[in-house]
Regions:
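Non-catalytic, glycine-rich low-complexity segments
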Residues: 21-40, 52-93, 108, 145-214, ...
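Substrate-binding clefts and catalytic carboxylate motifs of secreted carbohydrate-active enzymes
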Residues: 25-45, 57-58, 432-438, 444-523, ...
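Accessory beta-strand-rich segments of carbohydrate-active enzymes
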Residues: 27-29, 37-39, 76, 81-185, ...
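Short flexible loop/turn segments that cap and initiate beta-strands
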Residues: 46-49, 219-227, 264-270, 666-668, ...
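Active-site-adjacent substrate/metal-binding segments within catalytic domains
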Residues: 60-92, 98-119, 124-127, 179-188, ...
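Aromatic sugar-binding surface patches on proteins
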Residues: 131-133, 246-255, 693-700, 792-809
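Extended acidic/polar, glycine-enriched regions
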Residues: 141-145, 205-308, 701-709, 717, ...
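Conserved structural position at the C-terminal beta-strand
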Residues: 152, 275, 715, 757, ...
């Protein structure tokens, strides 16, 4: 019975760590690190005096803790970087080492150019800040005290076109294992076929690492078995097989009544591989008789992918449109160290909007994000890099402003690209959400750095700036095709179950190279005008919008063309870096803002994408007759906006004549809806007649005189029945704060608290910029207050923050057991508290 309990405990550990580590006993190694910002040449040595270093837990991003400055680079969000050291003291007893003699350290991500030492010995270097990697600590491990030291060199501050963060910004794992164990990332599966009777056959590859067994490895192989078991979502065994353990074994499992993974019902099986000794195949069903040596558990999703140049993309045999968004890896005030709970809320908000895919822009991201996409039903385009052998421009004085810098990752490309790409594919290949591997983003951007004579051809049909014509001194674009072939070959050597793609910025230039032919599916960035031209010119090419704007026309180019299977909108959320001139935290192109609140453009996108009824209204002043005539016959606001905020208070027109009176203001009310028609009511009375959907611009609008009260839009079917509605109200003066915990059911450690400034009737005061302070008692810490204002350059780590549009979100991490009270206050407003 004791052995049975131990086996269950082992399984529980694996369920927690399965997507990060695929062997041994893994435990998070995040607590009790020491940190020093600055270089210390002797900090790798175990006896180095670190008594004055800062105590912290990882994940940790030191850049987000720094002071924003207009003297720093705009591309990385006007935030500092530098060199930092981490040290961790830990103890392993003789019993620990005897029971599991091998010890490894696994980092999910360190930005960047890391060096890892154990007891003064270099374990390895990894320059890429986005890949996950494992080091064997066994040769240098000591009984008793040990010191792990990590040097992080982010001294090249402007080394990216967006904010990267600095430090050990993802989870760390300590892995202890027997001398013979399952190989890291060595258990994988692939769907062999779906059968007509509803069953499925899957092939499972299992790699075993015998390297530490030395000369005894052959004998040990003969004495060991692999037991492979597939269980359904309810834990019932549906397939099992056993075989002798070898360095690599392939088994086929037959799955009756196979349930498919899809976007609405992302069904996941669990595959458990157990390496055991002293048993036979006949004892597989008797867990108490198995002497388990190692075990791994992975999620399994059964789905088919089909791509066609004329029909687009089919998931499980059903042709569909990919409604994707591009995502960078930060979360505003939290920087790059993003808690799981924040990712959960972000992905759920995007899915609620109608998005069904995420492009990992432009690098492998945190493993937890792929897990969420598996469980929530989101397709993923996994991307390797943004830069190859030569640097791209990095704007330091504002996006596309001034003189660029040229730091980057190019200097380690040649040495590391094969391994970096291979590690991305090996780490992520078991995720059913992944349907595309990308070799890179915009590596063919004209003259940044590659050039080609075709750029002298006048209208090259490239929508982005070319910075002049052909530059003979620049690297020739023919190199792109050769490198793409190399990277694609690495991917295909590991996984052939998904196609290889790339995101092309200069399609016309790349068409003169081998690049499009080196990949299976060709992504077009902002080049919708080439969809039909190239479909006719290259009839075997599979085309989609790998990066597009949020405009209606870009979506119609996908919706109305069968051969274009989807788009990835830039971007799903606002992100730090790639900033404009100061003040600008980042690029606010998101459908969601920094705090993961849906923006007007997000509502517009929901009206285009969602299968659920959607209606939204926003308003802009067209004119005040006294002071807003431009003198040329046009009136301010005489356009239809996809960015209209949901405000219904008297607009302010600052000018020498003062504010216009309510009866002199004409408001343009815009409605985003997926209903066939909509009408507008003010205080219960019809003020906007029923209007049909406008397929030219995708927006319905009315011009009405402003009057306070409740404005309501109703999206209706053709019979006039209300399908969905949206109301906005005139708010009064701020009187109180209102608190709401967001997604409490998904909270493990980090609580997300919505703080709203409200009037006496509970309406959010959207004009409020009240400075809100947060004070905590009990075992918890404030990670940050996110107001989502892109021009607010105040300290990210203060305990107070101005509200933006009358709200902010607070991130509070529990650090221990016991009651926690979080109090929010602002001048002349009633405070509020929340306990948990």
């Amino acid at each position: 019975m004791q052995r049975f309990l131990l086996t269950l405990l082992w399984l529980a550990l694996w369920c927690n760590a399965q997507s990060q580590v695929s062997f041994g006993k893994a435990e998070r190694f995040n607590d009790d690190w020491l940190f020093h910002l600055g270089d210390e040449p002797k900090a790798s040595q175990p006896k180095f005096d670190d008594a004055q270093w800062r105590h912290l837990d990882v994940p940790h991003d030191w850049s987000i803790e720094g002071q924003l400055s207009k003297d720093l680079a705009s591309c990385t969000g006007y935030l500092p970087a530098g060199i930092g050291w981490y040290r961790k003291h830990f103890v392993l007893s003789a019993q620990d080492i005897a029971s599991l003699p091998l010890s490894y350290i696994y980092f999910e991500g360190i930005y960047n150019r890391s060096e890892v030492y154990l007891n003064g010995h270099l374990l390895g270097k990894r320059p890429n800040g986005y890949v996950s990697f494992l080091y064997d600590m066994t040769p240098y491990l000591r009984k008793g005290d040990n010191v792990l030291a990590v040097r992080v060199d982010h001294s090249r501050i402007a080394d990216s076109r967006w904010y990267t963060g600095s430090g050990i910004y993802r989870d760390v794992w300590l892995v202890r294992a027997p001398k013979v164990h399952l190989a890291q990332w060595g258990t994988t599966y692939r769907l062999k076929q779906m059968n007509e009777d509803g069953s499925a056959d899957i092939e499972v590859d299992v790699a075993v690492d015998f390297s530490a067994a030395g000369k005894k490895s052959t004998k040990k192989q003969a004495a060991m078995m692999l037991n492979v078991t597939l269980r359904d979502a309810e834990g019932r065994k549906v397939a099992a097989k056993a075989c002798e353990a070898r360095e690599l074994q392939t088994l086929t499992l037959h799955v009756p009544d196979a349930k498919r993974w899809d976007l609405k019902h992302p069904y996941l099986y669990k595959l458990t591989v157990e390496l055991s000794a002293g048993n036979t195949i006949d004892t597989i069903d008797s867990i108490e008789t198995i002497h388990s040596i190692d075990q791994a558990t992975i999620n399994v999703g059964l789905r088919t992918l089909q791509f066609d140049p004329d029909h687009g993309f089919a998931l499980n045999g059903k042709w569909m449109k990919v409604k994707g968004v591009c995502l960078h890896h930060d979360a505003g005030v939290l920087g790059a160290a993003v808690p799981r709970e924040v990712w959960v809320r972000r992905v759920k908000e995007l899915k609620r909007m109608g998005a069904n895919a995420i492009r990992m822009s432009h690098n492998p991201q945190a493993p937890v994000l792929y897990d969420l996409c598996d469980s929530l039903g989101m397709l993923v385009m996994d991307e390797g890099s943004d830069e190859w052998e030569f640097p791209k421009r990095k704007w330091v004085e504002g996006w596309n402003q001034g003189t660029p810098a040229y730091d980057g990752s190019y200097d380690f490309f040649e040495e590391w690209i094969d391994r970096d790409v291979a590690d991305m594919v090996r780490r992520d290949r078991n995720h059913p959400c992944i349907f595309l591997w990308s070799v890179g983003n915009e590596v063919d951007y004209p003259n940044d750095p590659y050039s080609h004579p075709v750029l002298d051809g006048g209208n090259a049909a490239i929508n982005q700036p070319m910075f002049g014509g052909y530059k003979p001194d620049a690297p020739h674009a023919e190199r792109i095709g050769k490198i793409a072939k190399r990277i694609a070959a690495v991917i295909r050597s590991i996984d052939t179950s998904r196609p290889v793609t790339g995101a092309l910025a200069g399609v016309v230039m790349s068409n003169e190279t081998e690049y499009p032919e080196a990949i299976d599916v060709v992504g077009y960035n902002y080049t919708e005008n080439r969809y039909d031209i190239d479909h006719e010119k290259y009839p075997r090419r599979i085309i989609y919008g790998s990066e597009t704007g949020v405009g209606y026309d870009a979506w119609k180019a996908v919706r109305d063309k069968e051969h274009i299977f989807g788009q990835f909108v830039w971007t799903g959320t606002d992100y730090l870096g790639e900033s404009g001139r100061w003040p600008s935290r980042g690029l606010n192109t998101g459908l969601l803002d920094f705090g993961n609140f849906k923006k007007p453009r997000g509502w517009f996108r929901a009206a285009l994408w969602s299968e659920e009824p959607v209606t939204y209204i926003g308003a802009n002043p067209i004119t005040s007759p006294r002071n807003n005539n431009r003198g040329d016959g046009r009136r301010r606001g005489n356009f239809v906006s996809a960015e209209a905020q949901d405000d219904w208070n008297l607009p302010v027109f600052p000018n020498r004549q003062g504010q216009a009176s309510a009866d002199s203001v004409i408001m343009r009310v815009v409605c985003y809806t997926n209903a066939p028609q909509a009408r507008l009511l003010l205080n219960g009375s019809l003020v906007g007649e029923m209007k049909p959907q406008n397929d030219t611009i995708g927006i319905i609008h009315w011009d009405i005189p402003y009057a306070p009260g409740t404005l309501r839009a109703e999206g209706c079917d053709l019979q006039g029945n209300v399908l969905s509605a949206y109301e906005i109200k005139t708010h009064g003066e701020a009187t109180a704060l209102r608190l709401t915990e967001l997604l409490p059911e998904d909270c493990e450690e980090v609580h997300q608290i919505l703080v709203e400034v409200v009037d006496k009737d509970g309406n959010r005061v959207k004009s409020s910029q009240a400075d809100i302070a947060c004070d905590i008692t009990g075992p918890a810490v404030l990670l940050g207050l996110e107001g989502s204002n892109n021009t607010d350059m105040s300290d990210y780590r203060d305990n107070h923050q101005p509200a933006y549009r009358g709200r902010l979100v607070a991130y509070v991490r529990r650090t221990g057991t016991g009651p926690v009270s979080v109090r929010f206050s602002a001048a002349d407003i009633q405070a509020a508290s929340m306990a948990f």
